[in-house]
Amino acid sequence: MSKIIPVSNLLDFYKKGLFPMADNADSEIINLYQPKKRFIIPINNFHVPKKLFKLFKKNTFTFKINNNFESVISKCQLANRKDNGTWINSIILDSYLNLHYEKKAHSVECYDQNQLIGGLYGVHIGGCFFGESMFSELSNSSKFCLLYLVAILKKNSF
């Protein structure tokens, strides 16, 4: 059984601008990072390329929220990355599952005929949503999840 970062600690980290990462999937060490700059998506002025928007409007996928958080974070852990690495180890996975059970971590999922083909997850504190990771098994499916998420955040006045 892996160690788990308590939910209260994770929330405190985010409030202080820190986020936890492992060096790789097998690491037993969690490092805290505090970047000088964080990427912020301005949801009220969110630019969607025309080609992507047309594809999104034509898609026949189903989107769900928090339907299968564990599969999303697991698929994010296994996603092919350019550097062949992941920052999601068993400690991160189990800790974020607990955060999800406390309704502080959420997933957006893209399904094609009931098969999970893309998704993202992140942490919600107050009026902020911190996107953590995404995966795509079909071209653009994770981008579609981001578009869906932005629409939800706008609707809920983030």
Label the predicted regions:
Residues 1-158:
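N-acyltransferase acceptor-side catalytic subdomain
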